[in-house]
A protein has these predicted regions:
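Conserved nucleotide-binding/hydrolysis modules and their immediate coupling elements
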Residues: 13-21, 25-64, 426, 591-723, ...
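OB-fold nucleic-acid-binding modules
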Residues: 1-9
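Conserved helicase motor core of P-loop NTPases
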Residues: 333-337, 342, 355, 362, ...
């Protein structure tokens, strides 16, 4: 038989997978060997093919004669022998391990096992490791998910995990013939969070979808534009840059004509908007930012000339006596703007300039005409929300809690809304807030434009200030209780690109110099290998210093947890670093710090990134609706759950690892919320939080913060990042590392500017004309 003449014939081959010789992460192409030493090759879409070594597999494909490697079997599909049911039992049904599934399928045929699970599950109690509690979990999970079998069988060969299969099934629950719909247009899977264009495209191309199909290009446009905005913070994109990104994603060389046709179609469908000549925005961001412009324009036309207090100076003198503080000229101006009838104010100030004091004075003034209960303060994070409440004395909520509580109403039932930490708020969230604020509600926006911009798309605070969309009061004077308190002064020097007086002795700031002697001479005078060794040794010294400082906070952290003051324990001490990778990156520091702060030997859950233990400090890393309970309901053992939005950046504590249910339970004390994470969701939704990136700490405040600084992180060194990191510390800021790297970061002013819909629309229309 001539092997090369059989290219249109399909064969089947089975055997035990002996060894994986090669696997390309990018193309998913692999070369492997069966136990009979037969070589096989093809694309396998599960990136963990090594996990099925030793398993019996069934291949469908064709024999080829490779010039270099000889006769091989090139497979089109690769499935475990018990593919359908084995996959379903191990990936979907809770309580059944891989070993248990193998034993069950060894004793029973598929039909027999399905019959037992449906009608006689108690028979499984005869198997080792399956007791009453586990059997209950297995049966409940089987009944809930048995209709997923067909979908699981179809998607398993593409490496789609059980968690995603469940999400797909739930999302498309009303769709008939779902598998056929996916085969026709696999890009509908992009609707599922976590399945990007690349994964959907792999499935599509393996199913024979035309590379130039309209829905392939349209799906890529939508996804690429959304990802570009989310990842870069821009809410619009230049046409030529957009086309370049599409070329990369689709594998085309200048596919401009294809893009032009698809883009016109999507603009006509209002899926993408033209913001200005040759700039485009996704529909949601265009809508949100356009509405923000309209909101402030409408409010500007409704300003009243009626004063709240006619004799303002006399009132202010009285208030300063009763409240026990005096206002500066700038702070007085802020209060006076509201007194003179403005319904909107941007109160902008850098660290230590008295934004909280000014906010309190403004709210006290407004309480002359509204009741205490008519005033609400809000912030993105629970910690920031608590802080504004503590400093002003007025009620506060997280933005999401306020939105959820009043989602059925047209407007918030408050006459005054104060938004704090506004630099953190992206376009969509800002729109959600203003869409609930009526024209006669006073809206005060408080923020620090020296900090990093919001996570997510948009640059609302910056744009509103740039185009004066409402009255602005800028606070510039820094307040210090005494000369030994320097955090605010040092931070503001850095913000201006100046090297501060960092070597002085302060009660709230300390620089630990762990430098390579004569750094620049060593760099220029030694070969690369020797200098790299010097850098490595110095990095280890920095790490040792960090761990020594961190160890001084262990006992107090333990005490706070023991006293059940979890919120305080989570914010007592925080290490903040610019990058994820490397010895002084988030991932390694989290591992090292976990050894210090959590020496528990109880059973833990290992994932690709971390080993999660009871009482670990963790952070939620992606906005997601999660299964949750109030702390009271959880303590009472309630079986009732609610779906609640958990935001990127929320700090929590692991209070239970349930190995029967495969669930990690996390307490978020600032939100009085307990959240349940399936084990297979941990790396995508959760992370250890002993160390965080600077971006993750936006809007947060910690009693004590430690920041490593080294030339290893040079790419991330700039004044905005360092300013943001230092201003996270309330009582003490430790900076540990290389002196020259610190001085370099202090002088490297961030020049990157975000592109936005607001800027596109208003740059030539300063007066809304």
């Amino acid at each position: 038989m001539d092997i090369n003449s059989q290219e249109h014939t399909t064969f089947k081959l089975s055997g035990v997978l002996k060894k994986v010789l090669f696997f390309n992460e990018e193309s998913k192409y692999c070369i492997a060997v069966l136990e009979n030493n037969q070589k096989i090759c093809g694309q396998y879409f599960d990136t963990h093919i090594e996990k099925i070594v030793g398993e019996e597999i069934i291949l469908t494909g064709n024999w080829i004669n490779h010039k270099k490697y000889g006769v091989q079997f090139e497979f089109e599909s690769l499935q475990l022998k018990e593919a359908e049911l084995f996959f379903f039992l191990t990936k979907i049904v809770k309580g059944i391990t891989k070993k248990s599934a193998q034993e069950l399928l060894k004793k029973y045929s598929e039909e027999e096992l399905i019959e037992i699970l449906n009608n006689n599950p108690n028979e499984l109690l005869t198997f080792k490791g399956i007791k009453d509690k586990k059997l209950k979990t297995i049966v409940e999970s089987w009944q809930k998910f048995k209709h997923l079998r067909e979908l699981g069988s179809f998607l398993s060969k593409f490496g789609v995990t059980s968690n995603f299969i469940t999400k797909i099934y739930s999302h498309f629950s009303e769709v008939d013939n779902l598998i056929e719909k996916i085969k026709h247009n696999p890009y509908i899977l992009i609707q599922i969070k976590g399945i990007g264009f690349k994964r959907a495209d792999e499935i599509a191309l393996s199913l024979g979808i035309n590379k130039q199909s309209d829905f392939r290009i349209a799906a890529c446009m939508n996804y690429t534009l959304r990802e570009y905005c989310d990842n870069n913070g821009n809410s619009s994109i230049d046409k030529h840059h957009f086309y370049k990104l599409l070329d990369e994603a689709l594998g085309f060389e200048e596919g401009f004509s294809l893009y032009e046709n698809s883009l016109l179609t999507m603009i006509n469908k209002e899926e993408i908007y033209l913001t200005t000549q040759e700039r485009y925005a996704p529909s949601m961001l265009y809508f949100a930012e356009n509405k923000i412009i309209e909101f402030f324009k409408e409010r500007a036309e409704e300003i009243s000339n009626k004063k709240i207090i006619s004799n303002f100076k006399e009132y202010l003198t009285y208030k300063e006596k009763t409240l026990g503080f005096s206002l500066s000229h700038e702070q007085t101006q802020a209060v006076e703007i509201i007194n003179n009838g403005s319904n909107t104010l941007f109160l902008i100030g850098y660290a230590g300039t008295g934004k909280s004091t000014s906010s309190r004075a403004i709210l006290e003034l407004l309480q002359e005409i509204v009741s205490y209960d008519d005033i609400i303060t809000i912030a993105l994070s629970g910690i920031a929300s608590q802080r504004i409440s503590d400093t002003t004395g007025y009620r506060s909520m997280t933005i999401q809690s306020l939105l959820m509580q009043h989602k059925e109403k047209d407007f918030f039932p408050y006459k005054v809304v104060l938004l704090d930490e506004a630099s953190m708020v992206n376009s969509v969230t800002f729109y959600q807030i203003i869409s609930k604020i009526s024209i006669d509600t006073v809206f005060i926006v408080v923020g620090d434009d020296g900090q990093l911009p919001a996570i997510g798309a948009g640059n609302v605070l910056h744009d509103c200030i740039k185009y004066s969309l409402a009255p602005i009061c800028k606070l510039t004077k820094i307040y210090r209780q005494n000369e030994q308190q320097a955090i605010a002064v040092i931070a503001n020097d850095i913000r201006q690109g100046q090297v501060p007086q960092y070597k002085e002795k302060y009660e709230d700031f300390k620089f630990y110099d762990v430098s390579i002697d004569n750094y620049y001479a060593a760099k220029n005078g030694q070969n690369q290998h020797n200098f790299s060794q010097l850098r490595f040794e110095n990095t280890e010294r920095i790490l040792h210093t960090i761990l020594n400082i961190a160890s001084t906070y262990i006992q107090e952290t333990y005490s706070l947890v023991k006293e059940k003051n979890i919120a305080k324990a989570l914010t007592l001490f925080q290490i903040i670093t610019p990058m994820k990778g490397g010895v002084l990156g988030v991932e390694n520091l989290n591992v090292q710090l976990q050894k210090l702060f959590n020496s528990s030997r109880e059973k833990s859950k290992k994932t690709k990134l971390y080993e999660y233990k009871l009482s670990d400090k963790v952070i939620h890393i992606k906005n997601e609706n999660m299964k949750s309970q109030s702390m009271t309901s959880y303590k009472n053992g309630s079986d009732e759950f609610i779906e609640k939005r958990v935001f990127n950046g929320q700090l929590g504590l692991i209070i239970k690892l349930d190995f029967d249910q495969h669930v990690c339970v996390v307490l978020y004390p600032n939100d009085d919320m307990v959240v349940f994470y399936d084990f297979d969701m941990l790396d995508s939704l959760l992370s250890l939080a002993y160390c965080l990136t600077i971006h993750k700490t936006q809007g947060m405040e910690y009693d004590n913060a430690l920041i490593p600084i080294t030339f290893s992180h040079y790419i991330m060194h700039n004044t905005k990042l360092l300013y943001t990191a230092i201003t996270r510390a309330k009582k003490m800021c430790h900076i540990v590392g290389e002196e020259e790297a610190f001085k370099s970061a202090c002088k490297r002013i961030e020049t990157t500017k975000r592109e936005s819909v607001i800027n596109d629309i208003l740059k030539n229309k300063f007066n809304f004309s």
